[in-house]
């Protein structure tokens, strides 16, 4: 991997974080009106070509592509916070961070026939936090490639994935695949040595 080095705490393949209780969250996600999906997807900050037709509802997002330490709530966070926070906390319990932060939190909805093209999460702000998925709904035709192997993630099973190696997702089934996807980091872990020079260089441009 060239450029800024990854957080040594991140998984290099995938890490099973165990089952989480998504009952209340799932019921509410499945009831989201189509018009809300359309509106939220139109205003999302993560409009990347590799994501193809995958739609998103973004609850929290980083302030910029270089530094994960700055992030903000988006309008959808407040009405969903009480449903999201228990799931987030349950999924990250094994990390043991005293003051863990979630810089990006979103729902990702892939329709039947959808495809997320092979890619890595290239922006520096993605190199430090853990990248975690919790499937809300899926089907047997959903295949993900993470950690050098094809995988199928079951509903309610939290997993950290390696977002810095090539990965892709394909939905060959006949129903939507919806994941809760978020990042998580320890603010008490010292920032990497490469971050300050990177930020200084960006200001000097």
Language-model-detected regions and their locations in the chain:
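Short beta-strand His + acidic residue motifs that chelate non-heme Fe in jelly-roll/DSBH
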Residues: 118-119, 142-144, 161-162, 166-174
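Non-heme Fe(II)/2-oxoglutarate
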Residues: 1-97
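A short hydrophobic beta-strand segment most commonly corresponding to one strand
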Residues: 129-135, 158-160, 175-192
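A short beta-strand-loop-beta hairpin characteristic of the jelly-roll/cupin
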Residues: 135-154
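Fe(II)/2-oxoglutarate
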Residues: 1-8, 197-205
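A short secondary-structure junction signal
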Residues: 116-121, 143-148, 192-193
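Tight coil/turn sites that cap or link beta-strands
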Residues: 112-113, 156, 164
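Conserved short histidine dyad/triad with adjacent acidic residue
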Residues: 107-125
């Amino acid at each position: 991997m060239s450029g800024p080095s990854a957080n040594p705490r991140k998984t290099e393949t995938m890490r099973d974080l165990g089952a989480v209780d998504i009952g209340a969250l799932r019921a509410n996600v499945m009831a989201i009106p189509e018009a809300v999906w359309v509106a939220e997807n139109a205003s999302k900050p993560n409009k990347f070509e590799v994501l193809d037709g995958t739609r998103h509802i973004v609850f929290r997002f980083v302030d910029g592509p270089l530094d994960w330490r700055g992030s903000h709530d988006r309008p959808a966070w407040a009405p969903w916070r009480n449903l999201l926070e228990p799931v987030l906390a349950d999924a990250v319990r094994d990390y043991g961070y005293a003051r863990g932060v979630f810089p990006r939190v979103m729902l990702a909805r892939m329709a039947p026939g959808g495809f997320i093209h092979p890619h890595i999460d290239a922006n520096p702000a993605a190199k430090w936090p853990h990248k975690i998925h919790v499937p809300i709904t899926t089907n047997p035709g959903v295949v993900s490639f993470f950690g050098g192997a094809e995988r199928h993630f079951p509903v309610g099973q939290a997993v950290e994935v390696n977002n810095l190696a090539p990965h892709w997702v394909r939905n060959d089934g006949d129903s939507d695949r919806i994941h809760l996807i978020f990042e998580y980091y320890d603010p008490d872990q010292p920032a990497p040595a490469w971050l300050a020079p990177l930020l200084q260089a960006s200001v000097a441009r």
